[in-house]
Amino acid sequence: MAAKFVITNSERLRTIMAPIATGTAIEYGDLVAVSSGLIVKAAAASTAVAYCVKAHPANSGTQIQITEGNDFTLRGTMDVVFAAAYRGVEYDINDTTQTIDQGGTTTKVLKVSIAEDAGVVGSASNVLVRINKPIF
């Protein structure tokens, strides 16, 4: 399965090892959040997120490598086709698909790039975002 988000711009990616609950599976490219002090897959209600650098199969240890901060750009997919008006706007993520939720503006964990190449008008793919509210 292709990664939901891919890093496209980072001079130096800072990462940390964070605790994860046994039995939790996280795929490479997933966004993650914190629940009860442990890393979980991010959902629409997540108020801060990080990027999962490596896949973490269920029952494969108690730590996971995630990004620290937000000094990098991600490429992801929107749940609708991109429009120029989406540049610079903050959005949520969708629960099940981890796409950029154009209709969601509650937690605003992602911010669409203001660059000319932030997305292709009429296409939902390859939209550039930054984590707007990093875990740490």
Task: Describe these PLM feature segments.
Residues 1-136:
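Surface-exposed, low-hydrophobicity beta-strand/loop segments enriched in small/polar/acidic residues
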